[in-house]
Swiss-Prot record:
GO cellular component term of the entry, any: cytosol
Sites where the protein binds L-glutamine: 53-55, 112, 140-141
SUPFAM superfamilies in the record: Class I glutamine amidotransferase-like (SSF52317)
Molecular function as annotated in GO: glutaminase activity; pyridoxal 5'-phosphate synthase (glutamine hydrolysing) activity
Stated name of the protein: Pyridoxal 5'-phosphate synthase subunit PdxT
Pathway the protein acts in: Cofactor biosynthesis; pyridoxal 5'-phosphate biosynthesis
Keyword Metal-binding: no
Family: Belongs to the glutaminase PdxT/SNO family.
Primary role: Catalyzes the hydrolysis of glutamine to glutamate and ammonia as part of the biosynthesis of pyridoxal 5'-phosphate. The resulting ammonia molecule is channeled to the active site of PdxS.
Catalyzed reactions: aldehydo-D-ribose 5-phosphate + D-glyceraldehyde 3-phosphate + L-glutamine = pyridoxal 5'-phosphate + L-glutamate + phosphate + 3 H2O + H(+); L-glutamine + H2O = L-glutamate + NH4(+)
Length: 192
């Protein structure tokens, strides 16, 4: 049985856990999901999710709890990791904001909240590499991926701007895939 971990210092933890379970079921995998709030659990996981929230707070809490180094080691070990919205910011090489301590596990730079404020939130059906049908992406104070290293594959774009990327075992999205009933992004990141 696979063990999934959802970093639970902020964000849509329950929604991501549900999406992971649905994706695992769709792919014929048995999977348990554990919420992670302290060090020591990440190394036990087979797959890991770093959700959204507020990136400066997330990066601070990860460091305070000692989870940051465990996430870096997890990614370096080649295990599948999905980072969404603020999780993408924290996973990036450069958040262009000194208040965010990035993990540098995804070789991209991001511009926090580039898609606007809360009132500028939107939904869009986007084409995603590896999915047969468009995905209903929800953008809430979403970051813009503005620099992508050659080792990073762009999986989806909005107005020619990357919003989903993959580098080896790490997938990052600007949007919130957990806020829909569609678990295909979780399936793409973890079970494809």
């Amino acid at each position: 049985m696979l063990k999934a971990g959802v970093i639970a210092v902020q964000g849509d933890v329950a929604e991501h856990a549900d999406a992971i379970r649905r994706a695992a079921d769709r792919h014929g995998e048995d999977c348990t999901v554990e919420s992670i709030r302290s060090a020591g659990v990440v190394p036990e996981c087979d797959l890991l999710l770093l959700p959204g929230g507020e990136s400066t707070t997330i990066s601070r809490l990860l460091a305070e709890e000692g989870i940051d180094e465990e996430i870096e080691a997890f990614a370096a070990a080649g295990k599948p990791l999905l980072a969404t919205c603020a999780g993408l910011i924290v996973a990036s090489r450069d958040a262009k904001d000194d208040r965010v301590s990035t993990l540098d596990i995804l070789d991209v730079s991001v511009d926090r909240n580039a898609f606007g404020r809360q009132k500028d939130s939107f939904e869009a059906a986007i084409d995603v590499e590896g999915l047969d049908e468009p995905f209903p992406a929800v953008f809430i104070r979403a970051p813009l991926i503005d620099e992508v290293d050659a080792a990073v594959e762009t999986l989806a774009a909005v107005d020619d701007r990357p919003v989903a990327v993959r580098q080896d075992n790490v997938v990052g999205t600007s949007f919130h895939p957990e806020l829909t009933d569609d678990s295909r992004i979780h399936g793409l990141a973890f079970f494809s």
